[in-house]
């Protein structure tokens, strides 16, 4: 008999809700075949809560299998082998599938169908999680509530969120996209203060 987590994995892999039952009507259905990408684990203590897969991840089926992933792994202080070890990290984007591009060629936001259907079930199936890394605004809004502080304000308050008495602390991070390279240069405290604590925490929970 499959355990509950494995059954949930298979349900998510079969999900086509954004194609077959889009929230805003069929004119807004997913323009391509969905390919849900998520990594759920009964052992990993760290949950990486991302945004949505990009095209390269859609093609490979591996989360963060791109330049953003390379930067994220550098932030975490882990190599690819450790990053894709289910016993170390669970990876649960806000939208499981590549949402497509907008008119300017940028990735669309995560599909709105995913989180209401799957997120609470997925989180409940992983009660061992001790830290959520909330990457980008969509994940931060879900896990922290709407902050109205922008990325700088939210990530800048990382100590407040990480060293909280909550059962599962949340550490907000900017998206590791190249588009945020300018922000990283303007905010040197991120590399000087936050990243050393992040790496120590990752080593403790996933080392």
Regions found by a protein language model. Give the residues of each.
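A polyanion-binding, active-site-adjacent surface
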Residues: 2-206
């Amino acid at each position: 008999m499959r355990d509950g987590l494995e059954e949930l994995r298979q349900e998510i892999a079969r999900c086509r809700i954004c194609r077959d039952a889009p929230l805003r009507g069929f004119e807004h259905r997913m323009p391509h075949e969905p390919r849900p990408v998520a990594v759920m684990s009964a052992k990993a203590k760290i949950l990486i809560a991302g945004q949505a897969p990009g095209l390269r991840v859609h093609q490979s089926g591996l989360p963060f299998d791109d330049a953003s992933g390379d930067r994220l792994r550098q932030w975490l202080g882990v190599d690819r082998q450790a990053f894709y070890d289910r016993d170390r990290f669970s990876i649960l984007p806000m939208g499981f599938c590549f949402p497509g591009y907008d008119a300017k060629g940028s990735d669309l936001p995560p599909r709105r169908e995913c989180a209401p259907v799957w997120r609470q079930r997925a989180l409940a199936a992983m009660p061992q999680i001790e830290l959520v890394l909330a990457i980008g605004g969509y994940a931060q809004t879900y896990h922290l509530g709407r902050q109205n502080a922008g990325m700088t304000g939210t990530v800048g308050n990382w100590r407040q969120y990480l060293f909280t008495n909550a059962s599962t602390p949340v550490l907000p991070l900017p998206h590791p996209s190249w588009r945020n390279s300018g922000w990283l240069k303007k905010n040197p405290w991120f590399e000087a203060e936050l990243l050393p604590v992040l790496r120590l925490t990752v080593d403790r929970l996933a080392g």
